C-alpha cells in the first residue's frame, strides 16, 4: 500500500472500471423502489465551472447513497444545447454553432467523467439533435390542434443587442437576462403558448409541493399574481365601444375622473387617429416604448402621459372622463387600462395635480372630512363612502361588493380574477433553435407541417448574420416551400425558432427513454421513472425553467400523454460558489493565480502593485474571482475537490472558496488512508467485529458505540437534510477517536472493533469520495466494487454510551464537569460533585443550603 493516496493513479483506474462494467446503467426494475435524481442539465459553454462541480457533486452523493440503500437509480446527463450564446460565439469565432456546440460537449463530457460522477451516459441527450427536437415539433402540432398555441401581432420584449424577442420571465429589471442590455417594446407577429389557461392550477399546486423551498413557491405565486376584483366597462364617447378595466377597488369608482391606457394598448392609436393629439401621442408612445417598462423601472420615472383626444363615460356618475396614455399603465397588468382615482391613489393624485385633472373624494376617513382643494396627498385608508349616490354612508369594504353587484345587474361589470401571468411568447428571431413546424400559405393561411415529414431540420448551410437576427428567412431552400394543402409554390416556412426554454421544459421525461422513436417518450418508462424524485439547480430558474416545466407537464397531462402534473417531487436550490475579488490598480480585476502574498501583503505578480482584496461574491469570469476545476483536479484530484465542495457549507448555502480548506480536506483523506493501512497491517488475521455492544467493555466498547453513533448521524444527515458537511464532521470525529485509541495488536476485541470502524468509515465516505473508497475497499480485501455494498446499519443498543457527562454549578454558575458511569445513583453523583477539586474551592468554608441533582445531567450546589 502506497504511503499516500495518489489520485492521479487511482481515479482513472476506477473510472475505467465503472465504464467497463456499466456500473451506473439504469433499467426499469419493478422489484426495487425507483429513485430518479436529476441536476439541471448544463449549457455547453466550453468547460465546467465550480458551480457545476458543486451542483453535480451534491447530486452524485445522494445517488450513490440511494443506490447503496437498495434503490434502482436513474441519474442521467445531457446538454441544453440550443441558444443565443452558441450562435454569438460561432459568429465571433467564424465557425458554425453546431461545430462549436459539439466540440464544447466533448470537452465538458471529459471533464464530468473525470469528476467520477455516476451518470448513465447511455441516456445522454443534446437538445440540438433532430432526434430530440423532432418530438418538440410533434408536440407543437398537437398543441396547435387543441388551440393551446396561437399566433398574433403584439408588443413584445425586444433585445436589440441579441436581435430577438424575450418572454416576460426573461426580462430581469428591464434588462435582457442573457446580455444585460436594455429591453424595448416592439410590435411583431409572435407564437404564444396559452400558459394562462393553467394559471389557477399552477397557483393552487404551489401549496402542494412540500418538497420545494418556500421561497421558490412564493416566487411562482407572486409571478402568477392572482388578484380578485371587478371588471368594469367604460363606454367610449362617440363610438359604440367600451374600455374594460380591471380594478381591485370598485368602492372608489365614483371618484374616477380620468382614464389611463398603456402606451401599447391597441385603442391608443385608434382613439388618437385624426385628432389634434395624434402627433403628440405617437411621439410619446414611441419614446416610452423604448424605455424600461417593468413595474420596478417605472418607480424610477416621473409619472407622465398625453391626452389622446378621446373621452369615456364613468358608468356610475355618467360624467365624461378624458382618456390619457400614461407611462405607468402596463399591458401586462389587468386589461392595460387604469381607472384613475386621484383622491385615493397617490400615483393618480400626482398625475392629476401635474395635468390639472379633477380630484373627487369618495371615501371619508373618521374625523375631519377631506377637501380636495387642500389635500397634499391621496387618502388610501379605510372609511365611509361619500358623494357615491345610493352607496354613500356604506363602509368602503361593504361597498366593494354592493357596487359590483349593482354593475352586474346593469350589465356594466362583473366580479372577476386577474393574473399577472401572461401567455408565453416562444418565437425567437435567431437561427440556433428548434424550427417552428408551420407553413404560411397566401391561400390557406397557417398550415401545420405533416407529422410524417418531421423533423423540420435546421439547415446547416445558414450564413450567420454579424448583427444577430435569423438567416433562415434568406435561405430559399429552407423558407420557400410548397403548401402541403393546395401545393402553391410560393408558400413560406415559418422562420422563427422556438425559445430554448421549450427544450428544457420536458427533457427530464425524455431521459426515461432517450432512444425511443415512436413518441416523445416510452409511456411505460415514464410511468416507472417519473416524476423526478429529487431535482437540483439554481433558484434563478424559479419563474423560468421551473414554472415552464410545471406548465408543460399540464399540457402533456391534458393531451393524455401522462397521468401526473408535477415534474419534480423535491427541489434543492443550491447556493453559489463565492470567492473574494482581487483588484490591481494597473490591471483591474486579476485572477487568483496572478496574485501572491508577500509579507502579509497581496501583490500583483505582473507589476508588483498592492492588490485590493474585495468582497466575497459569486465567482464570475468578469470579476476573475474564479477557480479553474481543471487546475484543481490536476493538483488534488476529483475526490478532494468533491470533499471540499461538500464540507465547506450546507448545500443550500453559499460556499466561500478557501484554499486552506482544500488542503485540509487533502490532509483528512490521507489520515484515513494511513489509518486504513495501520488497521490492515496491525490486525492482519482478524475480521471486523460482528457481535453486539453488550459483549464489549472498556475502550473497544467506547469505540464501537462511537462508530454506531457516526453511522446514524451520517445516515440522518444525508437522508433528511443533505447536510453533508455535518456528516463529514461526524466521520472526522470517528477518525480522531481511532487515532486516540490504543490499537493494541495483542487485543482481539480492539482489533475487531478497529476493523469494523475503518470499514464503516470507508462505506460512509464512499458516496462522497468514491475513487478513494473503492481503492481502500479493495485494499481491505473486498470486491468487486464498493458501489454494490449495502449502506451500513447501526445497532440501536450501541447508540448510548456507558458514561454520562455531569455539569456542576455553584449558585447557578458553571464550575466543573466530570464523567461517571451511566448506572450510578443520584447520591453517588451528589457526593462526587461535592468532592470535585474544582468545586471545592467555591464551597470551602461556606454553608451548603441545598444540593439539587438533575438526573443524569446536572448538579447545582446552593451555598
Swiss-Prot record:
Known Pfam families for this protein?
Anticodon_1, tRNA-synt_1, tRNA-synt_1_2, tRNA-synt_1g
Catalysed transformations (reactions):
tRNA(Leu) + L-leucine + ATP = L-leucyl-tRNA(Leu) + AMP + diphosphate
- Motif 'KMSKS' region: list the residue ranges: 618-622
The record's section on InterPro entries has:
aa-tRNA-synth_I_CS, aa-tRNA-synth_Ia, Leu-tRNA-ligase, Leu_tRNA-synth_edit, M/V/L/I-tRNA-synth_anticd-bd, Methionyl/Leucyl_tRNA_Synth, Rossmann-like_a/b/a_fold, tRNAsynth_Ia_anticodon-bd
What keywords would UniProt list here?
Aminoacyl-tRNA synthetase, ATP-binding, Cytoplasm, Ligase, Nucleotide-binding, Protein biosynthesis
Q: What is its EC number?
A: 6.1.1.4
Record-listed ATP binding positions = 621
Q: Record's GO cellular component, any one?
A: cytosol
Read off the SUPFAM superfamilies from this record.
Anticodon-binding domain of a subclass of class I aminoacyl-tRNA synthetases, Nucleotidylyl transferase, ValRS/IleRS/LeuRS editing domain
Which positions does the motif 'HIGH' region occupy?
A: 42-52
Any single biological process term in GO: leucyl-tRNA aminoacylation
- Give compartment(s): Cytoplasm
- Single annotated GO MF: leucine-tRNA ligase activity
The main location class comes to: cytoplasm
UniProt cross-references to PANTHER family, sorted A to Z: LEUCINE--TRNA LIGASE, MITOCHONDRIAL, LEUCYL-TRNA SYNTHETASE
Task: Family membership, please give it.
Answer: Belongs to the class-I aminoacyl-tRNA synthetase family.
Q: What is this protein called?
A: Leucine--tRNA ligase
Gene that this sequence comes from: leuS
Amino acid at each position: 500500500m502506497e504511503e499516500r493516496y495518489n489520485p492521479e493513479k487511482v481515479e482513472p483506474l476506477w473510472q475505467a472500471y465503472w465504464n467497463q462494467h456499466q456500473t451506473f446503467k439504469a433499467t426499469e426494475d419493478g422489484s426495487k423502489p425507483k429513485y430518479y435524481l436529476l441536476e439541471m442539465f448544463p449549457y455547453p459553454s466550453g468547460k465546467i465551472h465550480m458551480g457545476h462541480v458543486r451542483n453535480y457533486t451534491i447530486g452524485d452523493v445522494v445517488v450513490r447513497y440511494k443506490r447503496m440503500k437498495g434503490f434502482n437509480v436513474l441519474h442521467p446527463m445531457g446538454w441544453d444545447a440550443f441558444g443565443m450564446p452558441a450562435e454569438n460565439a460561432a459568429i465571433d469565432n467564424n465557425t458554425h454553432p453546431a461545430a462549436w456546440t459539439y466540440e464544447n460537449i466533448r470537452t465538458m463530457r471529459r471533464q464530468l467523467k473525470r469528476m467520477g460522477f455516476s451518470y448513465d451516459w447511455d441516456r445522454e441527450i443534446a437538445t440540438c439533435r433532430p432526434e430530440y427536437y423532432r418530438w418538440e415539433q410533434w408536440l407543437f402540432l398537437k398543441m396547435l390542434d387543441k388551440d393551446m398555441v396561437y399566433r398574433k401581432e403584439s408588443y413584445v420584449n425586444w433585445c436589440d443587442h441579441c436581435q430577438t424577442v424575450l418572454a416576460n420571465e426573461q426580462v430581469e429589471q428591464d434588462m435582457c437576462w442573457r446580455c444585460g442590455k436594455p429591453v424595448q417594446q416592439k410590435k411583431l407577429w409572435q407564437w404564444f403558448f396559452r400558459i394562462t389557461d393553467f394559471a389557477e392550477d399552477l397557483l393552487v399546486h404551489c401549496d402542494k409541493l412540500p418538497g420545494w423551498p418556500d421561497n421558490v413557491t412564493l416566487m411562482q405565486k407572486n409571478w402568477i399574481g392572482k388578484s380578485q376584483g371587478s371588471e368594469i366597462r367604460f363606454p367610449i364617447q362617440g363610438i359604440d365601444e367600451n374600455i374594460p378595466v380591471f380594478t381591485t377597488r370598485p368602492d372608489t369608482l365614483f371618484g374616477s375622473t380620468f382614464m389611463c391606457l398603456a402606451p401599447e394598448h391597441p385603442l391608443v392609436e385608434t382613439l388618437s387617429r385624426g385628432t389634434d393629439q395624434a402627433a403628440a401621442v405617437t411621439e410619446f408612445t414611441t419614446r416610452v416604448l423604448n424605455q424600461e417598462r417593468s413595474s420596478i423601472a417605472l418607480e424610477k420615472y416621473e409619472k407622465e402621459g398625453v391626452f389622446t383626444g378621446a373621452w369615456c363615460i364613468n358608468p356610475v356618475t355618467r360624467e365624461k372622463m378624458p382618456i390619457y396614455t400614461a407611462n405607468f399603465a402596463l399591458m401586462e397588468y389587468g386589461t392595460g387600462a387604469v381607472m384613475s382615482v386621484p383622491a385615493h391613489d397617490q400615483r393618480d393624485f400626482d398625475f392629476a395635480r401635474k395635468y390639472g385633472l379633477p380630484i373627487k373624494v369618495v371615501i371619508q376617513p373618521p374625523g375631519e372630512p377631506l377637501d380636495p382643494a387642500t389635500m397634499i396627498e391621496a387618502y388610501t385608508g379605510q372609511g365611509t363612502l361619500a358623494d357615491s349616490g345610493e352607496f354613500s354612508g356604506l363602509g368602503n369594504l361593504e361597498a366593494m361588493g354592493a357596487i359590483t353587484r349593482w354593475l352586474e345587474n346593469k350589465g356594466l361589470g362583473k366580479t372577476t380574477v386577474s393574473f399577472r401571468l401572461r401567455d408565453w411568447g416562444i418565437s425567437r428571431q435567431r437561427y440556433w433553435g428548434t424550427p417552428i413546424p408551420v407553413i404560411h400559405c397566401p391561400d390557406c393561411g397557417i398550415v401545420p407541417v405533416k407529422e410524417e415529414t418531421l423533423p423540420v431540420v435546421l439547415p446547416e448551410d445558414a450564413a450567420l448574420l454579424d448583427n444577430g437576427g435569423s438567416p433562415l428567412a434568406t435561405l430559399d431552400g429552407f423558407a420557400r416551400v410548397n403548401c402541403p394543402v393546395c401545393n402553391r409554390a410560393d408558400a413560406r416556412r415559418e422562420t422563427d425558432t422556438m425559445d430554448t426554454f421549450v427544450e428544457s421544459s420536458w427533457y427530464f421525461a425524455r431521459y426515461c427513454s432517450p432512444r425511443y422513436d415512436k413518441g416523445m417518450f416510452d409511456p411505460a418508462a415514464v410511468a416507472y421513472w417519473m416524476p423526478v424524485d429529487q431535482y437540483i439547480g439554481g433558484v434563478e430558474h424559479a419563474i423560468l425553467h421551473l414554472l415552464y416545466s410545471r406548465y408543460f407537464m399540464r399540457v402533456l397531462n391534458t393531451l393524455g400523454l401522462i397521468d401526473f402534473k408535477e415534474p419534480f417531487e423535491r427541489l434543492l436550490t443550491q447556493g453559489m460558489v463565492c470567492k473574494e475579488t482581487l483588484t490591481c490598480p494597473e490591471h483591474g480585476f486579476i485572477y487568483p493565480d496572478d496574485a501572491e502574498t508577500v509579507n502579509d501583503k497581496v501583490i500583483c505578480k505582473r507589476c508588483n502593485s498592492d492588490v485590493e482584496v474585495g468582497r466575497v461574491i459569486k465567482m464570475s469570469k468578469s470579476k476573475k474571482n474564479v477557480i479553474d476545476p481543471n487546475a484543481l483536479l490536476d493538483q488534488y484530484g476529483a475526490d478532494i475537490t468533491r470533499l471540499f465542495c461538500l464540507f465547506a457549507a450546507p448545500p443550500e448555502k453559499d460556499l466561500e472558496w478557501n484554499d486552506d480548506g482544500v488542503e485540509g480536506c487533502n490532509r483528512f483523506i490521507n489520515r484515513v488512508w494511513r489509518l486504513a493501512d495501520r488497521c490492515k497491517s496491525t490486525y492482519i488475521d482478524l475480521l471486523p467485529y460482528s457481535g453486539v455492544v453488550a459483549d464489549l467493555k472498556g475502550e473497544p466498547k467506547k469505540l464501537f458505540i462511537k462508530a454506531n453513533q457516526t453511522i446514524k448521524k451520517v445516515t440522518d444527515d444525508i437522508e433528511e437534510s443533505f447536510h453533508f458537511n455535518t456528516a463529514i464532521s461526524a466521520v472526522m470525529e470517528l477518525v480522531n477517536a481511532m487515532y486516540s485509541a490504543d490499537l493494541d495488536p495483542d487485543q482481539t476485541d480492539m482489533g475487531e472493533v478497529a476493523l469494523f470502524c475503518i470499514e464503516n468509515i470507508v462505506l460512509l465516505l464512499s458516496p462522497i469520495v468514491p475513487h478513494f473508497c473503492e481503492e481502500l475497499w479493495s485494499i481491505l480485501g473486498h470486491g468487486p466494487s464498493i458501489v454494490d455494498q449495502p449502506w451500513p446499519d447501526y445497532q440501536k443498543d450501541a447508540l448510548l454510551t456507558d458514561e454520562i457527562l455531569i455539569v456542576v454549578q455553584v449558585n447557578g454558575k458553571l464550575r466543573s464537569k466530570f464523567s461517571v458511569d451511566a448506572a450510578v445513583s443520584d447520591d453517588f453523583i451528589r457526593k462526587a460533585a461535592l468532592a470535585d477539586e474544582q468545586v471545592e474551592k467555591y464551597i470551602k468554608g461556606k454553608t451548603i443550603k441545598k444540593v439539587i441533582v438533575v438526573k443524569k445531567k446536572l448538579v447545582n450546589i446552593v451555598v
